[in-house]
Amino acid sequence: MNIRHRRQRATLAIGLLVFAIVPLTVLDPRTALAADGVTANEAKGMGLSTQWRGSKGLVTKGADGKVIFLYGEVQPSVVCSPLQVCDIELQGGEVVRDVLVGDTVRWKVEPRHRALAGGQAIHLIVKPSEPGLVTSMVVTTSRRTYHIQLKSHPTQYMARVGFEYPEDVSTKLADVNARLEASTIPGTGVPAEQLSFSYSISGSAGWRPTRVYSDGLKTYIQFPRSISGQDAPVLFVVSGGQNRIVNYRMKSNMMVVDYNIDRAVLVSGVGWKQQKVTISRGGR
């Protein structure tokens, strides 16, 4: 072995010795966050928020190519493109209170209205000014709050976006059960297949009706069993823009109205304790 080879071996041995003595330093993300003034609870909260925003939720195809997100499951991410329009459709009957966008300079959001049989539907028209943008949007309505992420892509975009609501699924299931059980409800005298269940119920009172249906002459409003023995809410039928009282009677937890109603309001309490529930024929 010549002198040069001996020197190379010695240099290699010294390098290995130094590597063994000096420990490998791994930067803990929590240490980095602490250095930025973020507490452990704040870091945990940001991690949970990131997990919710980045989770893969249910996305399905609706009518006319609409992309359907399940409301409340995850933060939906809507992809738009410059020179194109993204149409985000909210639930029929919702009233928009406020729209907040993180980047108001490069994103434009304009509300539009569409008439429905039972009211109107709000459409949010979203347009980015350039590709490669990411921001967030919060939409507050009369029923709920939407947290939506907006992204812009050079060419790809979602033309129509909508939502499926868990409470709607519950309502549809209740309607199915109502059809199966209606023939056993006293007082109707009409086969289940001849009853109309096309009513929507909006409101969050504790006595909120579980279902509403009509036999063509009378309207039946069924409340939770817990209302039995308690003061029932007062029923007002909306006609010509005014509320008027019609004849009705209570049978246990069932309100029987001697009228085929299209729109009505149930009211309980006064002042700040007042609770209201709206009943509408033909959906929201």
From Swiss-Prot:
Gene responsible for this protein: trbG
Signal among keywords: yes
Alphabetical keyword list: Conjugation, Plasmid, Signal
Family the entry assigns: Belongs to the TrbG/VirB9 family.
Gene3D superfamilies on file: 2.60.40.2500
Signal sequence annotation: 1-34
Disulfide-bond pairs as recorded: none
A Pfam family this chain is assigned to: CagX
Protein name: Conjugal transfer protein TrbG
Protein source organism: Rhizobium radiobacter (Agrobacterium tumefaciens)
